């Protein structure tokens, strides 16, 4: 009996030793990066929240709550509004010593003109922790940056713009196969345009038309008595209710509530002159000295991950550059991801959101818009 107990205790000792060895091996098998990621999540949960400036979209807010907040246990405090207003607030608060915002995701022009010159941004790449995020092989075109320094404004999306939408009861898409068709008398007073004097897709389309059609064309277009506004919802509502036949410069998410409600709005097939490639609302910047540095890092890595890009792309109807995220479904809403339609070389020729393009083509377009519209 004593011998049995002796062997039994020896067996238990060996079993415990093996278990400890397995645990130690499992712990050592964790890469340093994974260990640091776990610690970052733990610290982020203690911070409790991340403050993100994002585009106005109820679908996006709901998707972030469903996927990010439940996954990581970190609250997201979204700040929404017109980019020019929100970014001005970010600059003013930062200069006064207030550290409230952690990061901003939106269009490129506001970031280039408002945040970049003020020196308020930290490089994005050091915040990329997950291998699936920082390895360029997961991204069509590799890592693409908006700013000339290729450090501060990361471009996660690239798609051919869906910025022409029409009311199916007032316009047959075959009637507008060229931008020249918009100059016909029948469309006078029936066209809406997102104000090209302010940063956004209205300015993007306007500068593209200046490039391919020239100043005289834009003079004639202005003569069509267009409804020009900065309220995207109001423009989309006027289209859905039949007050306008066509609206220029609004993306899918502006029209989505009306489309989902069964109102007669659709994206217009691309005119024969083609269209520019947009980075949409997918430009990411991180603030210097963020209030919640760990929560910021967790959000950045989730946003740039396969899951985050799929969620963001579907909520806004814009095409991600991630190669492992399906974007073919976007064609159903009149959007084509750049990775599904053009080469990387063509992208650099057609894109219009880089700092260089903003300082040349967009600045010229904005100056002409102010001249013709004021």
What residue ranges belong to the model's regions?
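Short, polar/charged alpha-helical segment
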Residues: 34-45, 51, 55-75, 257
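Mature extracytoplasmic/periplasmic domains
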Residues: 282-349
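Conserved C-terminal helix/tail region of periplasmic/extracytoplasmic solute-binding proteins
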Residues: 33, 341-374
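Extracytoplasmic ligand-binding site segments that recognize negatively charged/polar headgroups
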Residues: 51-65, 77-91, 99-236, 240
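A ligand-binding cleft/hinge motif common to bilobed small-molecule-binding domains
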Residues: 111-114, 246-266
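Paired acidic/hydrophobic, glycine-rich loop segments that form the ligand-binding mouth/hinge
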Residues: 97-106, 245-251, 266-267
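Short, low-complexity disordered leader/linker segments with a strong preference
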Residues: 1-47, 374
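Periplasmic-binding protein-like
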Residues: 218-222, 227-229, 262-290, 331-334
């Amino acid at each position: 009996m004593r011998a049995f107990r002796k062997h039994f205790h020896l067996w238990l000792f060996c079993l415990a030793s093996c278990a400890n060895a397995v645990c130690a091996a499992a712990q050592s098998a964790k890469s340093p990066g994974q260990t640091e990621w776990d610690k970052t999540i733990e610290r982020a949960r203690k911070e409790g929240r991340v403050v993100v400036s994002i585009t106005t979209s109820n679908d996006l807010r709901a998707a972030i709550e469903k996927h990010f907040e439940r996954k990581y246990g970190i609250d997201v405090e979204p700040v929404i509004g017109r980019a020019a207003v929100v970014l001005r607030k970010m600059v003013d608060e930062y200069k006064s010593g207030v550290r409230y915002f952690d990061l901003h995701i939106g269009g490129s022009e506001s970031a280039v003109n408002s945040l970049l010159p003020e020196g308020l941004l930290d490089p994005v790449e050091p915040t990329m922790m997950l291998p699936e995020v920082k390895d360029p092989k997961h991204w069509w075109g590799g890592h693409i940056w908006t700013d000339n320094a290729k450090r501060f404004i990361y471009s996660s999306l690239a798609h051919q713009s869906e910025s022409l939408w029409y009311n199916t009861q007032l316009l047959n898409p075959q009637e507008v196969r060229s931008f020249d068709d918009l100059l016909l008398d029948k469309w006078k007073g029936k066209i809406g345009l997102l104000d090209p004097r302010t940063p956004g897709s209205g300015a993007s389309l306007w500068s593209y038309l200046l490039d391919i059609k020239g100043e005289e064309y834009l003079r004639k277009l202005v003569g069509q008595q267009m409804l020009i506004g900065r309220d995207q919802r109001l423009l989309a509502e006027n289209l859905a209710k039949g007050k306008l036949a066509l609206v220029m410069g609004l993306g899918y998410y502006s029209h989505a509530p009306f489309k989902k409600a069964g109102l007669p709005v659709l994206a217009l097939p691309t005119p024969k002159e083609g269209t520019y490639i947009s980075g949409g609302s997918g430009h990411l910047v991180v603030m210097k000295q963020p209030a919640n540095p760990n929560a910021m890092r967790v959000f950045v890595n989730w946003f740039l991950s396969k899951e985050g890009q799929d969620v963001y792309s579907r909520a806004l109807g814009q095409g991600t550059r991630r190669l492992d995220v399906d974007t073919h479904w976007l064609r159903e809403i009149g959007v084509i991801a750049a990775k599904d339609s053009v080469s990387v070389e063509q992208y650099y020729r057609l894109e219009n959101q880089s700092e260089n393009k903003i300082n040349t083509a967009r600045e010229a377009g904005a100056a002409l818009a102010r001249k013709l519209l004021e």
